[in-house]
């Protein structure tokens, strides 16, 4: 996932070398949950999951408890995301908007910050 101005775009690793030069930020992780509106995962193992998605000009950040990758992909799809990427889960999952809305379960060394 790369950020360009006020938008986000998803690239597969195979096409990262051809990504535009005006990228202002990026995130790489595994697995991809949605691509072009299609669900890419089938794992049913439950846990705390976090992800980031984009669709319809909107950026979505989701923390889901007791969810599988498939559950998380379906949540993003129901919100209108066409592309979504799993982020670190478990105790690393946190959502902050002035105060913590979810987590964290431990000190976190890095964060995705949306301004």
Sequence positions of predicted segments:
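Gly/Ser/Thr/Pro-rich low-complexity, intrinsically disordered segments
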Residues: 1-115
């Amino acid at each position: 996932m790369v950020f360009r101005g006020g938008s986000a775009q998803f690239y597969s690793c195979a096409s990262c070398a051809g990504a535009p030069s005006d990228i202002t930020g990026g995130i790489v992780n595994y697995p991809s949950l949605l691509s072009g509106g299609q669900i890419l995962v089938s794992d049913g193992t439950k846990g705390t999951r976090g992800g980031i998605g984009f669709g319809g000009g909107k950026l979505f950040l989701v923390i889901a408890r007791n969810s599988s990758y498939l559950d998380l992909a379906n949540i993003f799809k129901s919100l209108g995301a066409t592309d979504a990427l799993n982020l670190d889960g478990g105790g690393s999952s946190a959502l902050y908007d002035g105060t913590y809305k979810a987590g964290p379960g431990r000190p976190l060394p890095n964060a995705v910050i949306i301004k």
